[in-house]
Amino acid sequence: MNENSYWQKRNLQREKDINKQALHVENVLLRAYTQAQSYLTDKARQLFKRMQTASGLTEEQARYILNSSMPPETLVELQKQANQIDNAQLRKEAQNRLTAESYKFRITRADELKARSYIAAKQVADVQLQAQTEFYVDVIKKSFGQASTEIFMRRARELRRTAQFPVEVWNKETAYELTYIPTQQVETILNRKWLGSNYSKRIWGNTERLASKLEEMFTVEALTGKQEIEFVKELQAEFDTSFNVTRRLVRTEANYIHNQSQLEAWQKNGVKQYILIAVHDLRTSEICKKKDKQIFSVSEAECNGENGTFPPFHPWCRTVAVAYFGKHTLNGTIKALDPVTKETFDLPRGATYDDWFKKITELHSQDEIDATYKKIMASLKYK
């Protein structure tokens, strides 16, 4: 295995590791969303059970239920839930909401259900913020470490090539890793804004939208004419929508943080250029197809969506940036995947997405390619 193949293998393995970690985070968040949904579904069923109607609530019935008084002990229960939120800012927001309710002359059932919805959304945000922060910190440390290691090893190998005496500087059988990155740099990458926001602000925004949507569901207007089964389905739809956004955020932010960590290592170690590497498969976006193998100066790196020079370029973006050390970076061949047969074939390392797709069209008819694309998209749980 030559040096370029070695580092390509390391980079591919890093991508797989990040995706595996992301899947674990998504499963943690799915449990949090499912728990919150089950909790509010149970409260909704209790609400409908009071009227025992099979034809949907009338406006009068909905108004009667929502305007009835909330038992005093319920506020104590909600305050306990709010106090259990770990994140200080989220906990304060939940406590402030309940404080505002306590000042009212009479707290209605509508007030209670809206407060429950708000706290449930904050509990989800609490789990999400903790899980994603831990994930991203790990991505930063490992991606920065691997990028630094690659720079060190490539330069050491160049030293060996030009030295007047034998120097042992690289052993491909050893998994070298330079992992140290100052805490301040970790925080800088973690909180860096792109497209006007950062990961924590996007979590807040998504869960605030969920809270708002849930509160709207517990109004006279929303409940009038509703049957229990219909209401429960709408509740599930709101949670599904929010969770789909969450999955997109987890993956897109992971791509951003991985690439930013590498960029930090390049800037620190004087790397001058990088090259964009798009995934060669049928899911790749038109944006990333065009950017594949483009080379930029590190000083030009800008994460600005489709108009930027550094990934991610769009939601769910899988394109990565790789340090470019000159034409020899693209020497040799790579194993490319045939999406129709699932077999591999050789391509020049510098082959673009268009080069790969041209080879696929030479091997298969357009009908075969279209059918494969439909199967791939149908197999995805979330589009």
Give the positions of each predicted feature.
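N-terminal leader/targeting and assembly helices and adjacent pre-domain segments
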Residues: 1-226, 230, 328-383
